[in-house]
Curated annotation (Swiss-Prot):
Compartmental location: Secreted, Extracellular space; Golgi apparatus, trans-Golgi network
Name this protein carries in UniProt: Extracellular superoxide dismutase [Cu-Zn]
Any matching Pfam family: Sod_Cu
Organism placement in taxonomy: Eukaryota, Metazoa, Chordata, Craniata, Vertebrata
Subunit structure: Homotetramer. Directly interacts with ATP7A; this interaction is copper-dependent and is required for SOD3 activity.
Length: 240
């Protein structure tokens, strides 16, 4: 493709010489300067095309989690980030969840995380509305029903692939809220109305609004994920 662009540039240069009546074998200084300018522009365009191709058309989004403004002093202050990547508009969603600030006891407790309908944090996480449920299906079949996450030593770090939510199309979660709950999701098995609406997951501890971003945050988190896996394998080998 770069060769094609350069060929077009040379043809254009020849045409420029013909229009000015100059001998194409000895272009004047104006023609040489024009060729240099055009070459710089073509190079810039080519670099942009290659950068976009390297991104493979993937969509990225980030959500900076902050404690709900309505929490009382006794509640934990959960902070962190949730990152999303979708390789194509119809592809499944991948996500990194990296949160801290949970109580350290009891260890290995589970917390629910869901997408809620509104990106409205004017009244803390309470104003984010119900679960985002564009297809009017029962919980836990909402696209943003991410389920339960194990908390260890006050933090939560997890990679999940194949999520049903999307960053593209009419049911995009961009502009909506991710909410971290105080309790565990009963996955619709609680036997009451709240169970099929929100999984009886308890108070809304922290939340954020999903926003489009570049690939940099995801790439850094992916490198950290790879390093964590490597350290875990090394630790397991030493223990064995």
């Amino acid at each position: 493709m770069l060769a094609l662009l350069c060929s077009c540039l040379l043809l254009a240069a020849g045409a420029s010489d013909a229009w000015t009546g100059e001998d194409s074998a000895e272009p004047n200084s104006d023609s040489a300067e024009w060729i240099r300018d055009m070459y710089a522009k073509v190079t810039e365009i080519w670099q942009e095309v290659m950068q976009r191709r390297d991104d493979d058309g993937a969509l990225h989004a980030a959500c900076q989690v902050q404690p709900s403004a309505t929490l009382d002093a006794a509640q934990p202050r959960v902070t962190g980030v949730v990152l999303f990547r979708q390789l194509a508009p119809r592809a499944k969603l991948d996500a990194f969840f990296a949160l801290e600030g949970f109580p350290t006891e009891p260890n290995s407790s589970s917390r629910a995380i869901h997408v809620h309908q509104f990106g409205d944090l004017s009244q803390g996480c309470e104003s984010t509305g119900p679960h985002y449920n564009p297809l009017a299906v029962p919980h836990p079949q909402h696209p943003g029903d991410f389920g339960n996450f194990a908390v260890r030593d006050g933090s939560l770090w997890r990679y999940r692939a194949g999520l049903a939510a999307s960053l593209a199309g009419p049911h995009s979660i961009v502009g909506r809220a991710v909410v971290v709950h105080a309790g565990e999701d009963d996955l619709g098995r609680g036997g009451n109305q709240a169970s099929v609406e929100n999984g009886n997951a308890g108070r809304r501890l922290a939340c954020c609004v999903v926003g489009v971003c570049g690939p940099g945050l995801w790439e850094r988190q992916a490198r950290e994920h790879s390093e964590r896996k490597k350290r875990r394998r090394e630790s397991e080998c030493k223990a064995a």
